[in-house]
Amino acid sequence: MKILLASLLIFISFSSNAMTGNELYEKFNEYKKVNQNTIDIAFAAGMYAGYVDGAVDTFQVLDILCPSSLVTRGQLIDTVGKFLENNPEVRHKAASSLVYNALKDIFSCKKE
């Protein structure tokens, strides 16, 4: 039920900016180049980081993902990027579901 609710919330939250994993991966590649200091690269990097942050925040509010307070924003962003790099065959799927899939095995909330 929580997964369904999270999917619905993410769909509603991101529907105006819905993107696929391929688009998210492109932004991840720009994120990695941000030190080159071009406006387009910096913008894409910010979109990538913001998208991952927003998705993680949504999953945390719904108690679906529970990263430790010691986990940095950069670690989450890098983990999602690594998942996108290593799984090109799924990048046509919704970006929000790929963020979840990248993090679920590592940061799932413990069941009581």
What are these regions (language model features)?
Residues 81-112:
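Short, compact, well-ordered microdomains
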